[in-house]
Regions:
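Short, well-ordered loop/turn elements at secondary-structure boundaries
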Residues: 33, 40, 97-100, 162
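Short beta->alpha connector loops
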Residues: 29-30, 97, 109
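Short beta-strands within extracellular/lumenal beta-sheet-rich domains
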Residues: 83-97
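Extracellular/virion structural assembly segments
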Residues: 1-10, 14-15, 70-85, 101-110, ...
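Tryptophan-rich substrate-binding surfaces of secreted polymer-degrading and adhesive proteins
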Residues: 1-82
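Generic structural detector for well-ordered beta-strands
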Residues: 46, 92-94, 231
Length: 297
């Protein structure tokens, strides 16, 4: 099992436009009416009053402005998994990074994902993954079974460089490429995920239900989040280290990778969110603990 705190995102460049089409850029010298929508920096706001001359506050709802979220270019770096950055054919981003070894993409709609690491403008590492996959167990399934595209892809064991540049390319030629979240950082080994007791992965549906007068049920605002429970074996000498780490990052969402081998296709045990419970019976040499992770919406 690996845990990866999210590094600060510093975007150098991207093919995704900085400004969203059809949304006015905020002008501090202009007066806005109720319902006017503007964008400023990487945020979108809606005016909540007439004769509005107040300035919107970055990433916050105020008495004058309702914060609607990030612009398209920055949605894949916000605090939600339910929003996505989309662009025709491909998404290309370049980031300033330091000493990272793990990169993970969530909510992908893509055929391929490519990463490149540059040090002093020289390409020092690259890798590419196809997202298309098919599960077949017999000849009949081979001929008729539809394929699918992976929505989660992660890269491990990336060589670390300080002052490097990371370039990612998310490609879906002829369609809209999309990604809901991108995380990169330095991983910490949390031990060996056990197959027995079995790990669990569940999806929780946060749906609002309202019963109408005619008896029909109206559902709105359906959002889901993932919950993962893992049983992990760890050297007892590292228990204090793990507990201290979790205490330090108790209020910070992190990337949790339950099974490191990408070839095993166990992305259902990969989540980005917060640990909820950490139970650690301590043994003499080895300790087995259980950790419960709740993904963000």
């Amino acid at each position: 099992m690996l845990v990866v705190p999210k590094d600060k995102v510093i975007v150098i460049s991207s093919n995704v436009p900085e400004l969203d089409d059809g949304i006015e850029v905020y002008d501090q010298n202009k007066t806005y009416a109720t319902g006017n929508v503007v964008q400023t920096e990487d945020c979108i706001f809606e005016s909540t009053k007439d004769e509005n001359t107040d300035a919107p506050i970055k990433e916050k709802t105020s008495l004058s402005w309702l914060y609607l979220g990030k612009t398209n270019r920055h949605k894949m770096f916000d605090e939600y998994m339910s929003t996505s950055t989309t662009y025709k054919d491909e998404l290309v981003y370049e980031f300033a990074v330091n000493d990272i070894d793990t990169i993970c993409f969530f909510g992908l709609i893509a055929e391929t994902v490519k990463i490149e690491i540059f040090s002093e403008e020289e390409l020092v590492y690259e890798d590419i993954r196809d997202t298309y996959t098919r599960f077949v167990s017999n000849w009949w399934e081979w001929t008729v079974q539809d394929g699918r595209y992976k929505k989660i892809v992660f890269f491990r064991n990336i060589p670390s460089f300080y002052g490097a540049k990371l370039k990612v390319t998310i490609s879906f030629p002829g369609s809209l490429a999309s990604c809901s979240h991108l995380i990169f950082g330095k991983s910490l080994d949390f031990g060996i995920t056990l197959a027995d007791p079995k790990p669990t992965s569940s999806i929780r549906n946060m749906v609002s239900k309202e019963k109408q007068s005619d008896g029909n049920v109206k559902t709105t605002n359906s959002r889901i989040y993932k919950r993962v429970t893992l049983n992990v074996l760890l050297d007892s000498s590292r228990v204090d280290e793990i507990q201290s780490f979790l205490e330090e990052y108790s209020l910070t969402p992190m990337l949790f990778i339950g099974v490191e081998k990408e070839s095993m296709d166990m992305n259902s045990l990969t989540a980005y969110g917060f640990y909820k419970d950490f139970d650690q019976p301590i043994g003499l040499n080895l300790s087995q603990y259980q950790i419960e992770i709740e993904g963000i919406v």
